[in-house]
UniProtKB/Swiss-Prot annotation:
Disulfide bonds: none annotated. Keywords: Methyltransferase, S-adenosyl-L-methionine, Transferase. It holds the Pfam family Methyltransf_3. It comes from Mycobacterium marinum (strain ATCC BAA-535 / M). This is Putative O-methyltransferase MMAR_4217. Residues 1-20 are annotated as: Disordered.
Length: 224
């Protein structure tokens, strides 16, 4: 029939927004190898989240741009983000990854081994990130990736920035909580913490930040 709206294939369902279409295109443009797909399946099996393929590709690019000799990760999960980070790091780069769950570290180690990554290139640490980070050296890391409980994001940002060398990059995943952080009516503890982390980054004159609308939001900032 002439004049009908064909923007939605499902009657009664709203057409995807431009933002949704862009996100779907970004995710669909990235392919993952068998090792990454297996690690992603294991993440589902153990009930832990994993970065999307597009976020992973962004991590790989940022790791390469930063030099990728020394990278710290808060929240190992099943090793999906670690695999992406390592793919962009230098051949002799070392990934230090922290998780409070030994099972997560075990599964991630399996993924790294399957990818042919030697044990000298990863340092897996079990413990509370707030405590472990304080033991890492100042001004020594090219990139710090935060992908853990949003409630603790402000603490991780403070410690993460301390670890960065000049030109290093801090990357915070779940920085928009899928858009909730931008909703003025949302004031729960997670949203409050994420906003505080963003404020800390925005007000730090040493940092140049950008919020990237991939996954649940990625906030990245480079240190002067």
């Amino acid at each position: 029939m002439h004049g009908t709206d064909s923007s939605s294939d499902t009657p009664g369902q709203p057409a995807p927004s431009r933002a949704e279409l862009l996100s779907a295109h970004a995710e669909g443009s990235i392919s993952e190898d068998t090792i990454l797909k297996t690690a992603r399946d294991r993440a589902v099996d153990i009930g832990v989240g994993a970065v999307t393929p597009a976020v992973g590709a962004l991590l790989s690019m940022l790791a390469k741009l930063s030099g990728g000799k020394a990278v710290a990760e808060v929240g190992t999960g099943a090793g999906v983000s670690g695999l992406w980070l390592l793919s962009g790091m230098s051949d002799d780069g070392v990934l230090t990854t922290i998780d409070i769950e030994p099972e997560h570290l075990r599964v991630a180690k399996q993924a790294f081994t399957e990818a042919g990554i030697g044990p000298s290139r990863t340092r897996l640490i079990s413990g509370r990130a707030q405590e472990v980070l304080t033991r890492l050296a100042d001004d020594s890391y090219d990139l710090v990736f935060v992908d853990a409980d949003p409630i603790d994001q402000p603490d991780y940002v403070v410690e993460g920035v301390r670890l960065l060398r000049s030109g290093g990059v801090i990357v915070v995943h779940r920085a928009a909580l899928g858009g909730r952080a931008g909703d003025p009516a949302a004031r729960d503890a997670e949203v409050t913490a994420v906003r505080e982390a963003a404020r800390l980054i925005a007000e730090d004159e040493r940092l140049t930040p950008a919020l990237v609308p991939l996954g649940d939001g990625v906030l990245a900032a480079v240190r002067d």
